[in-house]
Amino acid sequence: LRTIMGIMRPIRKAPGTKLVSYEAAVDGTLAGGTSVAEGDEIPLTKMKVEPKTYGDIEIAKYAKSVSVEAVAKYGADVAVEKTDEAFLVALQNKVLGDFYTFLNTGSLAVAATTWQQGLALAKGNVLDKFASMDRDVTEVVGFANILDFYGYLGDKEITTQTAFGLTYVQNFMGYSTLFLLPAKYIARNKVIAVPVENIDLYYIDPADSDFAKLGLNYTVQGETNLIGVHVDGDYSRATGDMYALMGMKLWAEYLDGIAVATITPAETKSTKTVKAEQ
């Protein structure tokens, strides 16, 4: 997930800590400059550091169970491995669904008349926003309705990729990654753009020693421990049970650094003529 989204800053939250980041900025205007005479004391520029508090991460707990009857009927490959994969994808989609909902609250509004123009203006506006804050942008990721994407392509061929339930295309019209989503996540005629520098991933490590003190040992994989799982056999029910623990939140540091482009197709000449005649 981190690799696909290009997330730059995974931030581990230790138990007992609060989610707080700090922003530094010039308090007022720069002092000094060419007005300082030779030998005069150079005035200090006043700076300020302000804390920014985020909503706390809630721990989510899930479990699934596979019976010996299911294994006998379908085999372990289907009853266990396939359901394990589907279970983990569903967990990821829960996190992504919350993130997509949050993206739609972006306050950098953009108006466009075509889908292509919407993509271009959405990216241009976030680049302009971050440049005005003297912030660097290395990559911009986009989110679009999948039907709008294929409607734009028409009979043109382009290679899309699918991983962990995500459909996306890389290096498309200036976007490092363009995610193609169904209408339940992003409406038609809407495009969202956000720099990867504006995406933070806060997470709780399920393998944290504080949890182990409860006798809860979760297995994690990868560089960032996002989802912890534990598999145990329940002889009293003759089932194999998988337990999952996760606590993560995808967050955008600047709401006005998320461009939401709304596309309103321009009226055709014939349509305007008909209305005029009416």
Tell me the role of every PLM-derived stretch.
Residues 1-61:
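Assembly/oligomerization interface modules of large self-assembling protein complexes
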Residues 4-10, 44-53, 125-131, 165-168, ...:
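Intrinsically disordered, low-complexity boundary segments flanking structured domains
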Residues 27-45, 71-77, 223-239:
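Short charge-dense sequence patches
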Residues 47-111, 238-248:
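Long, contiguous amphipathic alpha-helices that act as assembly "spine/axial" helices in icosahedral shell
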Residues 71-79, 114-125, 215:
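Alpha-helix capping and helix-coil boundary motifs
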Residues 105-183:
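Extended, solvent-exposed, turn-rich assembly/linker loops in the middle of proteins
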Residues 160-278:
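Sequence/fold signature of self-assembling virion shell proteins
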